[in-house]
Amino acid sequence: MTTTVGIAVKDGVVLATDKRVTAGYYIAHKRGEKIWKIDDHVAATMSGGVADLQSVLSFLTLRAHEYKIEYKRPIPISALVNYMSLILFYSRPYIYIVHSIIGGVDEEEGAVLYMVDWLGTVTKEKYIATGSGSPYAKGALEVGYREDMTLEDAVDLAIKAVKAAIRNDPGSGEGIDVVVITRKEGFKRVFTTQQKLVLPSL
């Protein structure tokens, strides 16, 4: 259970997540990092089984580095997404419990955002939310998204979307992480906050 959000605009991609890590309704960790840097130009959010995600995203990171060494340029994001889809599809009947947003900026497509589910299904999106808090986050995205959004507007909207999920979903909480990926600066963490526990007066 979690909330992850992705928004693609002209100048780059924004990825945002909450920080609560759960096992069912047990809160296992309060400072989880759910945005995985694959390479300087691309990253993925983590929703689902942590061990499965770490395994699959490690493969993607290795493939991205191999591609850069072999071809002397960053891997196209569509190729990376197709590689992940093949891993998930051909792992059947064993299923990796993963649901990931992959976003970044490349020479082929500019700022681009994909969603990949545990069966290997791939969809290209302008904005998307995954995880148990996604109905609340998606509502905020539907209301706030505009085609002409600036990167700063997209960061603000991503934060609002994750906050909406945290307010309503017991599987999301503890704080927010936001990453921006642009052509000029690449992968950059731009916002993080940790919720403080406030005890009632006794």
Swiss-Prot record:
Q: What is its EC number?
A: 3.4.25.1
Q: Name the enzyme's class.
A: hydrolase
Recorded protein name is Proteasome subunit beta 1
> Which compartments is it annotated to reside in?
Cytoplasm
One Gene Ontology MF term = endopeptidase activity
Which residues catalyse the reaction? T2
GO BP annotation list: proteasome-mediated ubiquitin-dependent protein catabolic process
Tell me the gene name. psmB1
